[in-house]
Structure formats: C-alpha cells, structure tokens
Design a protein with these regions (language model features):
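Alpha/beta catalytic cores of group-transfer enzymes, especially the acyltransferase/condensing modules
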Residues: 24-178
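Alpha-helix C-terminal capping segments
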Residues: 2, 21-27, 192
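Glycine-rich beta-strand-to-loop/alpha-helix junction loops that act as flexible
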Residues: 15, 97, 200-202
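Phosphate/ATP-binding catalytic cores across multiple sugar-kinase/actin-like superfamilies
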Residues: 1-3, 40, 176-192
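Gly/Ala-rich beta-loop-alpha elbow adjacent to hydrolase catalytic centers
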Residues: 8-12, 16, 20, 28
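Helix-rich "cap/lid" substructures immediately adjacent to catalytic or cofactor-binding pockets
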Residues: 1-11, 60, 94
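Conserved catalytic block of serine-dependent lipid acyl chemistry
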Residues: 114, 126, 181-205
Length: 205
C-alpha cells in the first residue's frame, strides 16, 4: 500500500500495457487474460505464418530508418515495413512482411547500422498489416468492463496519460497497428520530474 500510494504513472511496453491496466485496477486479471489471448489470435490470423516478421535496428536515428522503410514500402505490397517500437534514440524495432524486413535489414546495414537483426517473432505487430486484427479487437473491447484507472496510464499509441474509458479502449485497438512510442513515454516521465522507475517483466528485454 505504501508503494502504491507513491506511484504517479503506469506504462507498459507493447503487450505490457495490459499489465499496467491491471495494476491500475482498470481491468480485471481474468479479463486481461482473455483479451491478450484473443488479441494474439486475431494478430496471427491477419498474416500467414512465415509471411511477417520484426527486426531490431541499433545505431541509426529514427529519421533514416523511417525514410528507408517508406522507400521500400512504395515498391510493392510484398515489401511493407515500418517502425514499430520507438525504444530509444538509437534503438528501433521495425515490423512488416518478411521480404520487406529482409530488404530493410540489408539497406540499413549499408547505411551504418551497428546491428540489424531479425527477431524470433512471426507476427508483425504495430504495423498496418494489423488493421484487420484491430477491427476485430475493437468489437471485443466494446463489451469490456473497463474502469477509469486508479493511477494515470501512459498509453503506447499517444505517449500521453489517459483517464477516459472510451479513449483507453480506442487506443487499445489502435495499438495493434500503431508504433509503440516508448522513447516519448520516458521523456514524458522525465518532464513530470519522475526520478525513480520500477521495472517489472518476465525477461531481459
């Protein structure tokens, strides 16, 4: 209780946003399990297994990564790729079709990336390939018993804190095809004079 009373904001990276909502008493643990299960199902259905992917890019600014992805995507639909996780000034995750990811990795290495490597995930989260999945998820969210969070939630889509239930639901559906603005989230916390961040997660990512 003493720790909770000192918490000013909650945020979760990508899927972690659901953990933040549970911690804020906005949704129940049981509802969150159902949501993430259905969310994963919709996302996997949106892109055939082996056709999508993601990659981590280290050592290049977002402007170069964004421009490269845009140029690749204009070639044809099989080469769709875009920034997905905006993690830090020098670390971005890109998402899209496998062919688009492979081409982007090669081009970004040529432009000086310290590291450009595919990650072991077949679902290209946080890109436009997930729009159909987002529409299905939005229908599921309509009937969700979501409450106003007890602690402000900084959502990935906007990197702003939200209280309104309908805003939170809308952002959760957009979340599937929108980039995770994690750098902006950290900068917002800094602007609010937050000096201590408690990180909880199942792994080392």
């Amino acid at each position: 209780p003493k720790l909770i009373s000192k918490i000013k904001f909650l945020a979760g990276h990508s899927l972690g946003e659901f953990s933040a909502l549970v911690a804020a008493d906005s949704i129940s643990f049981e509802d969150s399990l159902n949501l993430v299960t259905q969310r994963a199902k919709f996302m996997q259905e949106a892109v055939p297994l082996g056709k999508g992917g993601i990659a981590a890019i280290i050592g290049l600014p977002l402007t170069i990564i964004n421009d490269t992805c845009k140029k690749i995507t204009t070639i044809n639909n099989d080469l769709l790729v875009s920034p997905a996780n905006l993690n830090s000034p020098n670390q971005t995750v890109i998402s899209g079709t496998k062919k688009g990811i492979d081409l982007a990795i090669n081009q970004l290495k040529e432009q000086g990336a310290k590291m450009a490597v595919s990650l072991p995930m077949s679902v290209p989260a946080h890109c436009s390939l997930m729009i159909e999945a987002s529409e299905k998820f939005a229908l599921l969210l309509e009937n969700l018993n979501l409450k106003e969070p007890s602690i402000p939630i900084i959502q990935n889509v906007t990197a702003q804190n939200h209280y309104q239930v309908e805003e939170i639901k809308d952002n959760l559906s957009k979340h599937l095809y929108s980039p995770v603005k994690w750098l902006d989230t950290i900068l917002l916390l800094k602007s609010q004079k937050i000096k201590t961040i408690l990180e909880c997660g199942p792994g080392k990512v």
